[in-house]
């Protein structure tokens, strides 16, 4: 006889769930899309680069089902277009993973054009995506923000990136309280240093691989496992914030 005290008796299955992932073609977003698809979720992704989109859809198609469009979420109008396309393709959604982001440096070293673009992708698109997700979910489901430990580890060249991630952190906490009465869960996942397709400044792919081997850096798949954990909690439980750090991440 099943023991109802066992939390796993209420663990929801991902099979058949409809999930949007902003980004979803490289790095953390791609790892999330592949893992969730392997558990039976149907995925909708986007990319600025049609080549990345085609490659990601091929990979996800090896383990599950996915759709996507080539679109740049830096354009505010494109966020709604992406969500409308996803809802149409999937027939509704059960979760939105707001993940698409680009690197940014210190404000004194960035051009105004690059600064505006970073804000559009890393902050404005996050809020607009949450707005679209809340409307699409209506009265159930999950919104997961992929933030960064950069919100807490403030370096000399991180003013823009850390500032935006700090903003996402505060927004996520307030939104969680706002949407709770509507049966929509909101979680913020904050990864530490994670191997990325966009290169860290002065940190080559070979150096990233060595850092991962030394457990000083995470793999994108580690964050995907965290997303899976959040999405498979019983309805009575919510993971409000999840920090995932390398065991040996050096202090900044």
What is each residue range found by the language model?
Residues 106-119:
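Substrate-binding pocket helix/loop in short-chain dehydrogenase/reductase
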Residues 130, 164-165:
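Active-site helix of classical SDR
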Residues 39-55:
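Conserved glycine-rich Rossmann-like NAD(P)H-binding loop of the short-chain dehydrogenase/reductase
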Residues 50, 70-82, 112:
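The beta1-alpha1 cofactor-binding region of Rossmann-like NAD(H)/NADP(H)-dependent oxidoreductases
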Residues 25-26:
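Conserved glycine-rich cofactor-binding loop
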């Amino acid at each position: 006889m099943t023991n109802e005290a066992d939390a796993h008796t209420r663990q929801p299955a991902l099979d058949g769930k409809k999930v949007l992932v902003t980004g979803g073609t490289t790095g953390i977003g791609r790892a999330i899309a592949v893992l969730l698809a392997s558990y039976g979720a149907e995925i909708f992704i986007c990319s600025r680069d049609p080549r990345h989109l085609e490659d990601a859809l091929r990979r996800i198609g090896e383990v599950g089902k996915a759709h996507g469009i080539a679109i740049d979420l830096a354009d505010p109008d494109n966020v709604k277009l992406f969500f409308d396309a996803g809802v149409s393709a999937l027939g509704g959604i059960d979760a939105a993973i707001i993940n698409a982001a680009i690197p940014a440096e210190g404000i004194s070293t960035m051009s105004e054009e690059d600064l505006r673009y970073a804000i559009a992708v890393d902050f404005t698109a996050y809020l607009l995506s949450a707005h679209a997700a809340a409307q699409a979910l209506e009265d159930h489901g999950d919104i997961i923000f992929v933030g960064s430990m950069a919100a807490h580890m403030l370096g000399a060249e991180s003013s823009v990136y850390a500032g935006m991630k700090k903003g996402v952190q505060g927004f996520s906490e307030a939104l969680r309280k706002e949407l709770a009465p509507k049966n929509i869960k909101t979680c913020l996942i904050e990864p530490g240093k994670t191997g990325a397709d966009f290169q860290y400044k002065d940190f080559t792919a070979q150096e990233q691989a060595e850092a991962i081997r030394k457990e000083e850096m995470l793999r994108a798949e580690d964050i995907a496992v965290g997303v899976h954990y959040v999405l498979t909690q019983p309805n009575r439980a919510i993971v409000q914030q999840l920090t995932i750090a390398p065991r040996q991440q050096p202090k900044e």
